[in-house]
Amino acid sequence: MAKEKIVLAYSGGLDTSVAIQWLVESGYEVIACCLDVGEGKNLDFIKEKAITVGASESYTIDAKEEFAEDFALIALQAHAYYEGKYPLISALSRPLIAKKLVEVARQEGASAIAHGCTGKGNDQVRFEVAIHALAPDLKVVSPVRDWKWSREEEINYAKEHDIPVPIDLDNPFSIDQNLWGRSNECGVLENPWTTPPEAAYDLTVSLEDAPDTADIVEITFDAGIPISLNGENMSLANLILTLNEIAGKHGVGRIDHIENRLVGIKSREVYECPAAVTLITAHKELEDLTFVREVAHFKPIIEQKISETIYNGLWFSPLTEALVAFLKSTQKFVNGTIRVKLFKGHAIVEGRKSPNSLYDENLATYTSSDTFDQDAAVGFIKLWGLPTKVNAEVNSKVTITTEV
């Protein structure tokens, strides 16, 4: 009798390597699936390792471009910062991974999908809600959450089954990375009073080690999409990765954040997102130049909601679809170039230009070239201030008594 097939989100690390053997012992035929979303994984090595550990098949997928164009771009155009700080690094990759897991499951005729998340993080929610949204008939299994082993028990299990134990297992941090940034938690970071050690960082340098000379970059957007960096056209994924290097060497994008997790606890997270911070800063500046006032004032409401919705694992939901539709409708005239100075942890906008700019220098100037009709201000002020004046006239006639 054929075994039930299960597709495992495989990273090549200890947890998911042990999960392969555990699932095999549980009676499954395991198909491993690993995505590269910009963290620079050695996909060939991971593919071979999955087979060595016990998977019957191993898929490795380079998904950098899809991640950049269909997921990171939404976060960029939404200026997405959960709680005003976190640019949704891991939260963005989970729905894409879930989508690919479902595609592989359909191709292989699998009846279940497994992931390597623990029972106290947000990712278990994101994976399972996304999978159920895309394939409600598929069962979801969480080995790490189910077996409840200590780290020592997990290592012993690996050794007993000849599963390679990673040489960096003593790394005190839990790290997740994609092209939109790098997240870091656990170890000494669990004490919110402790200063993050430099060992916690990889994409950025400290302010002390940042160069004393700034880099100036010019980012060109077409309909809200970054299309070139310093005059060189490149794919969105390559542009983000290139900007990670340039902005990272200036210490741009370090974030130390106490975060309210979806599962109800607070966690201390350290993020590095040099490209994300730089691009969001530039994109916001271009919107300020090209948006009418009413859209500029309303869009932040949508931005906050879409940030929360994505963080909470609802990427594949009617609400997210509606929010993204509004977002896309605002980007038609977000065209132009922004000049940004990268220096000592800062991304500072120093220049902006756009064929769709609503800034009129002749209206803004106080020189003799001024074309603003100042006489029109008198009537405008009378009408604008009329409700305030009427309120004052009416209520000034009311005697207010205060009892002591």
UniProtKB/Swiss-Prot annotation:
Q: List the disulfide bonds.
A: none
Oligomeric form and interacting partners? Homotetramer.
Listed A to Z, the keywords are: Amino-acid biosynthesis, Arginine biosynthesis, ATP-binding, Cytoplasm, Ligase, Nucleotide-binding
Superkingdom, taxonomy of origin: Bacteria
Alphabetized InterPro entries for the sequence? Arginosuc_syn_C, Arginosuc_syn_N, Arginosuc_synth, Arginosuc_synth_CS, Arginosuc_synth_type_1_subfam, AS_cat/multimer_dom_body, Rossmann-like_a/b/a_fold
Q: Which family does the record claim for this protein? A: Belongs to the argininosuccinate synthase family. Type 1 subfamily.
Q: Which GO terms describe its biological process?
A: argininosuccinate metabolic process; L-arginine biosynthetic process; urea cycle
* Protein's cellular compartments: Cytoplasm
Under the heading CDD domains, the entry gives: ASS
Which residues are ATP-binding? Answer: 9-17, 116
A Gene Ontology molecular function term of the record = argininosuccinate synthase activity
Q: Which NCBIfam families match?
A: argG, PRK00509.1
User: Which source organism?
Assistant: Listeria monocytogenes serovar 1/2a (strain ATCC BAA-679 / EGD-e)
Q: Which residues are involved in binding L-aspartate?
A: 118, 122-123
- Residues bound to L-citrulline are 86, 122, 126, 174, 183, 259, 271
GO cellular component terms, alphabetically, are: cytoplasm
Q: Which reaction does it catalyse?
A: L-citrulline + L-aspartate + ATP = 2-(N(omega)-L-arginino)succinate + AMP + diphosphate + H(+)
- PANTHER family per record: ARGININOSUCCINATE SYNTHASE
Give the pathway listed in the UniProt entry for this protein: Amino-acid biosynthesis; L-arginine biosynthesis; L-arginine from L-ornithine and carbamoyl phosphate: step 2/3
What is the designated name of this protein?
A: Argininosuccinate synthase
Which Enzyme Commission number(s) are listed?
6.3.4.5
The protein's gene is named argG
- Keyword field contains 4Fe-4S: no
